[in-house]
Curated annotation (Swiss-Prot):
<protein>
    <recommendedName>
        <fullName>Nicolin-1</fullName>
    </recommendedName>
</protein>
<keyword id="KW-0493">Microtubule</keyword>
<comment type="subunit">
    <text>Part of the neuronal tubulin polyglutamylase complex which contains TPGS1, TPGS2, TTLL1, LRRC49 and NICN1.</text>
</comment>
<dbReference type="GO" id="GO:0005874">
    <property type="term" value="C:microtubule"/>
</dbReference>
<keyword id="KW-0539">Nucleus</keyword>
<dbReference type="InterPro" id="IPR040235">
    <property type="entry name" value="Nicolin-1"/>
</dbReference>
<dbReference type="GO" id="GO:0005654">
    <property type="term" value="C:nucleoplasm"/>
</dbReference>
């Protein structure tokens, strides 16, 4: 299935403080990133791709177009997706990630806006985010190939033409010719190579035969 990149605008991150903001131990453990699509009509999202940078868990909310009389609502489509198996180790910290619509908790049609919620509970990393964010929708379908009518609807097996009255059966004639050819080959193989004289009978000449020549 082909895909097409959707132009988007990624807003700056908003940090939610975890801990006491009056002490040095307080640090942002949650970041929020809003993604808008100002030049695109509501679309069906197929894939989200990005490079992780020390984000341990990811949640995504989507705002979808419903109708002209109903305001669009935010719906959670991905909840606490694990990007780092152990937030305190490097595994998965800088991996490329692809998320597809079948992994989402809701239908991804008529998308207006996305909100990415990033969490990193470990105090070991000074910063975390996601980079190189790309949004994709389904591309145009490939034009269907047309085939000739004779290829789409094969002609049934042809029936042998009826025999013309008065003519011999060609199959029978072919069989008889084959037999005659085989008989000729047998005679040729068994023919003696000794030359017999025209008037020679047992090594002598017959006078009667000679008189008629």
């Amino acid at each position: 299935m082909s895909r097409v990149s959707v132009p988007c605008h990624v807003k700056g991150t908003v940090a939610l403080q975890v801990g006491d903001v009056r002490t040095s131990q307080g640090r942002p453990g949650v970041l929020v990133i809003d993604v808008t699509f100002p030049s695109v009509a509501p679309f069906e999202l197929q894939e989200i791709m990005f490079k992780n940078y020390y984000t341990a868990f990811l949640s995504i909310r989507v705002r979808q177009h419903t109708s002209t009389h109903t305001p669009a609502k935010w719906v959670t489509c991905l909840r606490d997706y694990c990007l780092m198996p152990d937030p305190h180790s490097e595994e998965g910290a800088q991996e490329y990630v692809s998320l597809f619509k079948h992994q989402m908790l809701c239908d991804m049609a008529r998308v207006l806006e996305l909100r990415l919620i990033l969490r990193q509970p470990s105090p070991l990393w000074l910063s975390f985010t996601v980079e190189e964010l790309q949004i994709y929708q389904q591309g145009p379908k490939s034009p269907s190939m047309t085939f000739p009518k004779w290829l789409s609807h094969p002609v049934p097996c042809e029936q042998p033409a009826p025999l013309i009255e008065g003519l011999p059966d060609p199959n029978r004639v072919s069989s008889e010719v084959q037999q005659m050819w085989a008989l000729t080959e047998m005679i040729r193989a068994s023919h003696t190579s000794t030359r017999i004289g025209r008037f020679d009978v047992d090594g002598c000449y017959d006078l009667n035969l000679l008189s008629y020549t």
